[in-house]
Amino acid sequence: PAVMATRALENQRDRLKTILITPFMSCSARLTIYVLLADMFFPKSAMLVAYSLYLVGVAMAILIALIVHRMTDNKTENALLIELPEYKIPNLRTVAIYVWEKIKDYLTKAGTTIFLASIILWFVMNVGPAGFISDVADSFAAKFGQILVPVLKPVGLGSWQIAVALISGISAKEVVVSSMSVLYGIGNINSAAGMAELSGILGGTGFTSVNAYALMVFCLLYTPCIATIATIKRETQSWRWTLGMVMFQLVLAWSAAFLVFQIGSRLF
């Protein structure tokens, strides 16, 4: 909805700038990641840590907006004037038709992209070189996750399980938590015992509070979910712009997590 709301901006350049920074605002799906990791690794200040991620997102959006503003030609200024109509009781039939048209438009355009991407993600998570698998460790996703380990190691996320969880998070950010639960063999991540077990497993691999915060920062800034990507494609009418945004967010997420991990490791 936030991306689609940019239609109210008359200038195409302003729309693209707004679409670029909108994904940096934390959604409710990311909150599940913050709550889980903050509660496990920052038990005394979990709420402050979770709130800090929201502030990081806002600060990053402002910074990127300022940089883009200075890099582009801004000679033309547009005053956003919206004529407010007279308030009236809406006609239910008119509202129903309007809502149906929007839903149909979304399902036929953005929904198609979401469906295809979901099939691809399901395939790589459930199929491996030997065919259909019962253990995710044998899947194509796990193989790809192992390839990503050297890339993610400098940011403190050097395990294939975390890499696969991040890949699955492209479908929906809350899936990162459930994927980590499955990949690390946790029965019920929503219980105190499950969280303690996952914390113990991660701690045994050298995963500290610094790694946890780096992971939260990465989840905040990296590629948004499929639905958002599809909506961006629909609003910009450009795969080049959409894929460019995805790559930019990946690089930004890696860079920010790198700074957090490297600086944090030296200070704590």
Predicted features, each with a name:
Residues 1, 74-98, 141-143, 184-197:
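Juxtamembrane inter-helical linkers in multi-pass membrane proteins
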Residues 38-40, 54-68, 114-126, 216-222, ...:
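Hydrophobic core segments of alpha-helical transmembrane domains in multi-pass membrane transport
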Residues 23-26, 41-42, 48-64, 135-153, ...:
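Small-residue-enriched core segments of transmembrane alpha-helices in multipass membrane transport
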Residues 48, 74-77, 87-132, 139, ...:
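Long hydrophobic segments that form regular secondary structure
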Residues 65-79, 129-135, 265-268:
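Juxtamembrane/interface segments at transmembrane-helix termini
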Residues 24, 28-51, 227-238, 259-268:
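Transmembrane helix-loop junctions at the membrane interface of multipass transporters and ion channels
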Residues 2-16, 119-250:
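Extended, low-charge hydrophobic alpha-helical regions
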Residues 1, 20-35, 52-61, 171-177, ...:
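Membrane-embedded alpha-helical segments of transport systems
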